[in-house]
Curated annotation (Swiss-Prot):
Name of the protein: Glycerol kinase
Residue sites binding sn-glycerol 3-phosphate per the record: 13, 83-84, 135, 245
Species annotation: Ligilactobacillus salivarius (strain UCC118) (Lactobacillus salivarius)
Enzyme Commission code: 2.7.1.30
Keyword match Kinase: yes
Modified residues (Phosphohistidine): 231
Length: 504
């Protein structure tokens, strides 16, 4: 009973998990609970912040019940989270004044467009590393303050608090004593100056957001506070790690060297490159962000966000009903006999990096009378790889770094067909992590370092294993022919929607 463990709270877009890791980085227990998605209007996505909180408590309890591990055996807690999702709550009662507005939600697009029309794109990009988009927290805060009666005045009086999910959960777990976020989450708000490492007063003034709303910003591996005993089954345990989900996955992949790149195939795909101690401002619509900070040292990152990745396979299963499970897509792709002439562009919610075209919609090209169900499934699966190449090509252009290896994780990373096609299309090695729990593991590592559970990153590197390595097998001519077809399909998709808009 004297063994110690680290707990990672992994709060995602559709479910939350509490995972307990041992000293070797092995998962020894897990609790998971889904929560409801709210869609008040087309394009809007919201969560109930209290449902998320209750789901966290439930998963913590389930992880202890299933394993027999006691709360007092937890040496530290790390929190990783869906980024950008925005909550504002009453400082005294702890009650949210509106639902959490989720990162996917487009309900604040008009606020973002107004900033673009007024000419603030360059200023905000230079200060925050981000493009102006409804994706980020800033416009979501402004929307809530505009649409909840009295919210602006209460915010100015210091009666309200803002937080992304990490901040909300830390505030709740500590019994309302700690209002804090970390550099990785702060850098996704569109309010944080990544050069000064402070909330940017000019942007706050531009959006009329009171600074009193905002949390203190700290590193990713330090003790932020202790759990209130009544929220952690009688134990006060340090919360000692915090990171947005994609930065946590970067750390979980131990992508600690400059130029190392990982891709998480989740609901979307998130390709992140460690750029070291200096930010690289993209000239090609990638996002400059903070990767992680340990012992006062900042590591920056370059990111390309693809909105639809694994969710394209969910679309095949739930909406099209042509597969029964996502893993079935691998068998179908292998049984397809066509020559890759079908292209699916899954722009269901627009196109992310490097296009950032919110008006684009999904399209299919290259159908013939002989096209089969398996061909269609294969083309959908291949779209994940094509979108990833779009981002990696752009990263190489922005940084001048030739990327030799892509490290991958996430649910779709179990698909061998996808990873072989990805390697072929990139003409690069693709390495699947031995432990695919890289998001939770990353924040567990950060939490463990802060409390001495692990000594340093050298000790962590000894725990990292590659599950399988894929090498390119496709000829250069075939590779470039296929990719040229994809680029044509994307261009046609964008033209189609924009021509419709012009004719309205």
């Amino acid at each position: 009973m004297s063994d110690k463990y680290i707990m990672a709270i992994d709060e995602g877009t559709t479910s939350t998990r509490a995972i307990i890791f041992d000293k070797k980085g092995n998962k020894v227990a897990e609790g998971q609970k889904e929560f409801r998605q709210y869609f008040p209007q087309p394009g809007w996505v919201e969560h109930d912040a209290n449902e998320i909180w209750n789901a966290v408590l439930s998963t913590i309890a389930n992880s202890f019940i299933s394993s027999g591990i006691q709360p007092k055996q937890i040496a530290g807690i790390g929190i990783t989270n869906q980024r950008e999702t925005t909550i504002i709550w009453d400082k005294e009662t702890g009650l949210p004044i509106y639902n959490a507005i989720v990162w996917q939600s487009r309900q604040t697009s008009d606020i973002a467009q107004k900033l673009i029309d007024e000419g603030y794109s360059d200023t905000i990009h230079e200060k925050t590393g981000l493009i102006i988009d409804a994706y980020f927290s800033a416009t979501k805060i402004r929307w809530i303050l505009d649409h909840v009666e009295g919210a602006q005045e209460r915010a100015e009086k210091g009666e309200l608090l803002f937080g992304t999910i990490d901040t909300w959960l830390t505030w709740k777990l500590t019994g309302g004593k700690v209002h804090v976020t970390d550099y990785s989450n702060a850098s996704r708000t569109m309010l944080f100056n990544i050069h000064d490492l402070k909330w940017d007063k000019e942007i706050l003034e531009l959006l009329n957001i009171p600074e009193a709303l905002l949390p203190e910003v700290k590193g990713n591996s330090e003790i932020y506070g202790q759990t209130a005993a009544y929220h952690f089954f009688g134990s006060q345990v340090p919360i000692s790690g915090m990171a947005g989900d994609q930065q946590s996955a970067l750390f979980g992949q131990l992508a600690l060297e400059d130029g190392t790149v990982k891709n998480t195939y989740g609901t979307g795909s998130f390709i992140v490159m460690n750029t070291g101690n200096k930010p690289v401002l993209s000239k090609n619509n990638l996002l400059t962000t903070i990767g992680y900070s340990i012992d006062g040292k900042i590591n920056f990152a370059l990111e390309g966000s693809v909105f639809v990745s694994g969710s394209a396979l969910q679309w095949l299963r739930d909406s099209m009903e042509i597969i029964e499970s996502a893993p079935e897509s691998e068998r179908a792709a292998n049984e397809s006999t066509n020559h890759n002439e079908v292209y699916v562009v899954p722009a269901f919610t627009g196109l992310g990096a490097p296009y950032w075209d919110s008006d684009a919609r999904g399209a299919v090209f290259g159908l013939t009378r002989g096209t089969t169900k398996n061909d269609f499934i294969k083309a959908t699966l291949q779209s994940l790889a094509y979108q990833t190449r779009d981002v990696l090509d752009t990263m190489e252009k922005d940084t001048g770094i030739k990327i030799p290896v892509l490290r991958v994780d996430g649910g779709a990373a179990m698909n061998n067909y996808l990873l072989q096609f990805q390697s072929d299309l990139l003409n690069k090695s693709v390495e699947r992590a031995g432990n695919l729990e890289t998001t939770a593991l990353g924040v567990a590592f950060l939490a463990g370092l802060a409390v001495g559970f692990w000594k340093d990153t050298d000790e962590l590197k000894e725990l990292f294993t590659v599950g399988r390595r894929f090498e390119p097998e496709m000829s250069d001519d075939a590779r470039e022919y296929l990719y040229a077809g994809w680029k044509n399909a994307v261009e046609a998709t964008r033209i189609f929607k924009h021509k419709i808009n012009e004719n309205l």
